[in-house]
């Protein structure tokens, strides 16, 4: 019985590994947008948190400190979207596998 249980667990782990690869590929292809001040500043980041684009409305260029804050705000918004997508994709990949409390994927 122990052998069958172990084989089942190994099969489940292999399935989870395949689902994880798929989820990671989806994350790598993901691109999300964040914006601040009604679109004065827009950023696009990848599912790997890489900054892809920054668009700044000319009206936001007058105040450097405000512009810096708007860039951070737009990036933070996009970052949160990637976090949510990552959590959703990874929870789907690990569905049915017991995970320790606080265990976060991807590593």
UniProtKB/Swiss-Prot annotation:
A single MF term (Gene Ontology): DNA binding
Give the record's keywords alphabetically.
Answer: Cytoplasm, DNA-binding
Q: What is its main location?
A: cytoplasm
List the record's Gene Ontology CC terms alphabetically.
bacterial nucleoid; cytosol
Q: Which NCBIfam families match?
A: DNA_YbaB_EbfC
Function, as annotated: Binds to DNA and alters its conformation. May be involved in regulation of gene expression, nucleoid organization and DNA protection.
Q: Which family does it belong to?
A: Belongs to the YbaB/EbfC family.
Q: What name does the UniProt record give this protein?
A: Nucleoid-associated protein Pnuc_0701
Q: Which organism is it from?
A: Polynucleobacter asymbioticus (strain DSM 18221 / CIP 109841 / QLW-P1DMWA-1)
